[in-house]
Amino acid sequence: EDGELILERQYRHGLGVVSTEICAGVVEDGELPLHAAQRELEEETGYTGGEWEEIMTIAPNPGVMDNLCHCFYARGVKKTNNQHLDATEDIEVFLCSKEKVKEMLLRGDFIQALMVAPLWKYFTLQKDDNKR
C-alpha cells in the first residue's frame, strides 16, 4: 500500500543458496489460481486483501512439463496475520522499495526465472501506466 514490494528470502536446496523471491506456491486440486495466490501470500507473509490482477501466465519448461505459472499483482494488501508456514518452510519476509527491487533485478540478485519474468512485467506495466 505504501509503494513497497513484499519479498522473501529462503534457502533453496537445489542450488545451496538463500534466494530472494516473490511469494509463490502450488495451486491445489480444484483451486483457482487467484485463490491459490491469495492463500499463499497470507500463509507465507501474513498479508491479505487488496486488488488482484493476473499480469501473465508462463510455462516454466514446456519441452518436458505441462504446468503453468500464473503471476498476479496484488495492490493495497495489508499485514493482518502472522505467517502460517509448512514444517519444511523457513521464510524471511521483508519490504523493499520499487527502485531497490529494480536495482536488484539489474544486478542479478533474483536467480529464478519464474521470479524475474513477472517482476520485469510488473515494471513494464508501471512504465506504461506512467505514460498515460
Name every feature range the model reports, one short phrase each.
Residues 1-39, 77, 85-87:
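Conserved Nudix-box catalytic region and its N-terminal flanking loop in Nudix hydrolases
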Residues 18, 29, 54, 63, ...:
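Nudix hydrolase/Nudix homology domain
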Residues 46-47, 110:
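Helix N-cap/coil-helix junction residues
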Residues 48-55:
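A short coil-to-beta-strand element that immediately follows conserved catalytic motifs
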Residues 61-81, 94:
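Active-site-adjacent beta-strand/loop module that shapes the phosphate/pyrophosphate-binding cleft
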